[in-house]
Design a protein with these regions (language model features):
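Noncatalytic, solvent-exposed loop/strand surfaces
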Residues: 1-343
Length: 343
């Protein structure tokens, strides 16, 4: 079974013969689609969270589709009208009333009963954009999402953000003027990346007048004293790093309604990856965030076991894997790190 965001679902046998296909509308999304279909019994389940609205409506056309694995026929669909684009693949969990489909997206973690897809519970607190896939183990669901913009820590260090913008200080006076916001300048989201990298900062319009207006707004937002400069103290004092909070939670499935206060056993707010999914092994959770920071968390208590910096820098986009007693972590720059599992 394969899913292409630009086409839909296809099914092949092991000789590569197409058995059926199901064209689907391409979800509208800033970054494209990344959710994979998952199988449950005779069903194939796909979540298509979407920025596009239903016809003549102000609510999203996001939905969960359940298809027959045999012929691609739609068995049921459940709309998610208040959800927008998301990139997390759902997972299956065993709740107190049976199996559940667990979906992370648009600020919340939600559980749907199987096989009928009825929504049962939700847990809140995540940022708008979530990518990692939830995990299950030890009778819990573990789900994670960084702060919007990629910040991994609740109390992020503001200095890298200042270093990213002061690099555009053309006259070298230690301050930034509006006229120095040239070239690849934008407000940084991920200061560990070079300016000009697609993930470095706030996307700017291509049209000159709109681009100028956006940069004017960025400058005025930080220049609170209106002296025509950003200096280090003013920038750091006025800096807001993303929206929402970086979050890893442990949730007991099987609840009803909003379970944020009743079934979330713990939350953790440091070293949360933006793109990679965490991995659970021997009651420990391992996470790698941008900049090459490896964080290990006790899965029962939600307490940090250790936090170490790897040799790689820049972005970490690949999810870690475990082979034997070794954790394998690959950076975007091509560095592969092997770390012994355990405390």
């Amino acid at each position: 079974f394969v899913y292409f965001g630009s086409f839909g679902l296809l099914c092949y046998d092991h000789e590569g013969k197409e058995l059926w296909k199901k064209p689907l509308a391409t979800p509208r999304s800033l970054y494209g689609t990344s959710c994979s279909p998952i199988a449950y019994g005779e069903m194939l389940i796909l979540v298509t969270d979407d920025d596009a609205n239903l016809p003549d409506s102000k609510v999203s056309r996001s939905r969960i589709l359940a298809l027959s694995k045999k012929n691609g026929r739609t068995l049921w669909e459940r709309h998610r009208p208040f959800h927008r684009s998301g990139w997390s693949t759902p997972t299956l969990a065993k709740g107190s009333q049976g199996m559940e489909l667990v979906v992370l997206g648009n600020g919340s973690l939600r559980g749907y009963s199987l096989p009928d897809g009825e929504e049962k519970w939700q847990g809140d607190g995540f940022s708008r954009e979530t990518i990692a896939r939830p995990m299950t183990g030890n009778g819990k669901v573990y789900a994670s999402g960084s702060r919007l913009g990629g910040s991994a820590d609740l109390n992020a260090d503001p200095l890298p953000f200042w270093k990213a913008v002061i690099g555009f200080d053309a006259n070298g006076d230690g301050r930034l003027e509006r006229k120095e916001m040239t070239g690849h300048f934008t407000f940084p989201f991920r200061p560990q990346l070079p300016p000009g990298h697609p993930g470095f900062g706030l996307p700017l319009p291509q049209e000159a007048e709109k681009r100028k207006a956006r940069l004017d707004g960025i400058f005025l937002r930080m220049d609170k004293n209106r002296d025509g400069f950003w200096d280090k103290d003013e920038f750091i004092g006025n800096l807001t790093i993303g929206r929402g909070k970086p979050l890893l939670v442990a949730v007991r499935p099987g609840g009803l309604g909003n379970v944020t206060a009743s079934r979330v056993e713990w939350e953790f707010n440091r070293g949360i990856p933006e793109v990679p999914s965490p991995i659970l092994h021997d009651r420990l959770i391992y996470m790698v965030s941008n900049g090459g920071v490896l964080t290990c968390v006790d899965a029962d208590l939600g307490k940090m076991v250790y936090r170490r910096r790897l040799g790689g820098y820049g972005q970490y986009l690949a999810s870690p894997v475990i082979a034997g007693n070794r954790l394998l972590l690959a950076s975007e720059e091509g560095l592969l790190s092997l770390v012994r599992t355990g405390r």
